[in-house]
Amino acid sequence: HNLNLIFEQYISRFAELNDLDGNDEGYKWRAESCFVEHWDIDAEDFVSMFKASTKEMSNLIDNATVQPIGGILLLLKQPNEVEFVRECFRELYEEDGGDLEARQDRIYVFMEKMNAKIDQYASGSWKYPQKMNNVIYYLSLRYPNDNYIFKATEATEWANCIEYGDDFGSGETFSLAKYYRMCDELLSAVSENDEIMELHSRRFEKEARGFDDELHILVYDIIYCAHTYHFYTDGIIQTTSAKERIKRAQIRDEIEKLEIELAV
């Protein structure tokens, strides 16, 4: 089973992946701790608060090519835009009672407003705009036990490997609910793996302060590491294409329906 093979690699390479002088994947939990410690939407000095909250994100968001946090900081350099940024985050972080469609709508609104404003100060920039995965990460920072970090390549590769029976799409067709459902399935599988739970609880004790994400960052870490550290390329793990995966899922559903009908 592909999932067990991935879990085996995650366990056997855990020390290497979390080596502070090496890959240091534990920084994801430190970034969350830092955000939780400093975030205050009503802070008098919003700019300093925002910088303090986001300072440990490392390459989770900004890298040499794209800098969405840099885009927000560009706006925060303009004294007359600070309240605009604050209100965008306030709207994004509204309670939604678990309504993922409403949440996805707020993601789009945040992107549209922010990007239109960023364009006023950095016209045509490809470096600063907010993308879907960035905004999902902002949500994960604020409500880590209610969201999952998302990166398209890693997520699609994972779905193909485990033959996830649904298509969360991409771009305009993306479905937050379907992506989160896939993550929920991984969450329930990994929480039954005693070895990973043991390794993770030691890491969590070391790296995390002031929050309980209910293993949601761990779920993303497994999806991310499987892609980044080539868990799929040892020849044992067979991956399918998204198209083939969805087709197989539909056939499975039809067989199940027939079996139910025949059993009646």
Predicted regions and their residues:
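An N-terminal alpha-helical hairpin/helix-loop-helix interaction module that forms a charged
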Residues: 1-128, 144-264
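Contiguous, well-ordered alpha-helical segments that form the cores/surfaces of helical PPI scaffolds
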Residues: 134-142, 156
